[in-house]
């Protein structure tokens, strides 16, 4: 098991000059801020199937039968769909250790959503496609965190994606070390507040599932189901309302330890966040201060307080 999360990435986003026009789309956050904390596995599917750099632009063509094909824009009958599908079939089984994948938006091979579709006559259609390589990856690994470069400029989506990367990495490490009922229960306990912040209905559904762990003889089968449920919950970005519920829940742990002035101050800070007057870091910082003064083993174990390295500063941009 790697000592850092391994993240797949479209090669052009690393600065490699592999785009159809011979250029790249190097992303500063990815290559500067995030790079010290992950190991990248870059791939350009179009180069991987033997296409040159530079090369004519490719398009997704929706046929009259509804099939999606990948063809050259200047030669609509020159089809590379089978080559791309064959590459995906060979390559995707080798990336099971990945904790996430960052793909290039709008690409006919890598785009995650809203890729332009064309008809067979070359007329522009809806932005409703998914790149062939990414579509195959999403089908094979539905739990894998996948995000586009453009969407990572959104602070909420960026924070959510990075949190999912580190969650899946920790879960995969648990499996690599050898599964036990104790380790699975301890993992879930650590993630309770994080899950509650992301999706309350999912949190309520996964709890009884974990409570029935003793009924499972095959722990790996349980792991597969649990991974699916966990990552589906975390896919929902944490909302202000859910964050507020979690913060108030944590506040209750300090009811007896704090004096009336401290309790009132903490409540005002949480309500200030709920009203949008304060950033999420305001109540979190105060709660961490009280946790240092009044240690609680359960709270100290919670992933919610540090779902990824604090030095990434992802919550600084979340209001």
Describe the predicted segments one by one.
Residues 146-319:
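Acidic, Ser/Pro/Thr-rich low-complexity regulatory regions
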Residues 14-22:
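Short N-terminal binding/cap micro-motifs at the start of the first secondary-structure element
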Residues 10-11, 44, 102-106:
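Short beta-strand segments
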Residues 67-87, 97, 123-190:
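Divalent-metal-activated hydrolytic enzyme cores
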Residues 45-67:
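Short, surface-exposed acidic-centric catalytic microdomains
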Residues 87-119:
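N-terminal glycine-rich phosphate/adenylate-binding segment common to multiple enzyme folds
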Residues 2-7:
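Extreme N-terminal starter segment of soluble prokaryotic enzymes
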Residues 23-41:
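Short catalytic helix/loop segments, enriched in acidic residues and glycine
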